[in-house]
């Protein structure tokens, strides 16, 4: 087994590791980010729609997670109203590439977590069957 040395494993200063699991979890693995990704796949795209999700994301956390997803090109924002300026958040190709992962998380939750909301999961799978998978 090869030993990773400091010279051979220069880490981008933005990330704390060269491990793809660690870095993916740093980007997506908190309590709220995957809920936002789910909502985007379900067709929600505005700040107020994200706030209306049943999980009740606090506004400061919502703003922070949207910024992180924007900064990492997982989503883009487009103005849909000029006065006052309002934005729609849209998955990029990079964001849409998460679809099979989200699908597997949904399926795993349905199988292994009692009381999982079948209706929401089925809505997700149905909405994303055509375009994302």
Describe each region flagged by the PLM:
Residues 1-28:
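N-terminal leader segment of winged-helix/HTH proteins
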Residues 3, 67, 89:
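A positively charged, amphipathic N-terminal helix/segment that binds anionic biomolecules
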Residues 19-61:
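N-terminal helix-turn-helix DNA-binding core of bacterial DNA-binding proteins
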Residues 29, 81-105:
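Basic, amphipathic "hinge/linker" alpha-helix immediately C-terminal to the N-terminal HTH DNA-binding motif
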Residues 48-84:
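Canonical helix-turn-helix DNA-binding module
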Residues 100-133:
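Amphipathic alpha-helical dimerization/coiled-coil segments
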């Amino acid at each position: 087994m090869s030993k990773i040395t400091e010279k051979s494993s220069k880490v981008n200063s933005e990330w704390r590791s060269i491990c793809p699991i660690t870095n993916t979890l740093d980007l997506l693995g908190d309590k709220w980010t995957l809920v936002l990704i789910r909502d985007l796949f379900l067709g929600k795209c505005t700040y107020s729609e994200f706030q209306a999700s049943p999980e009740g994301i606090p506004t400061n956390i919502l703003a922070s997670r949207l910024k992180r997803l924007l900064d990492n090109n997982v989503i883009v924002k487009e103005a849909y109203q000029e006065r006052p300026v309002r934005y729609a958040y849209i998955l990029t190709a990079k964001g849409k590439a998460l679809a099979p992962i989200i699908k597997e998380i949904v399926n795993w939750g349905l199988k292994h977590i009692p009381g999982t909301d079948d209706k929401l999961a089925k809505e997700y799978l149905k909405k994303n069957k055509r375009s994302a998978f």
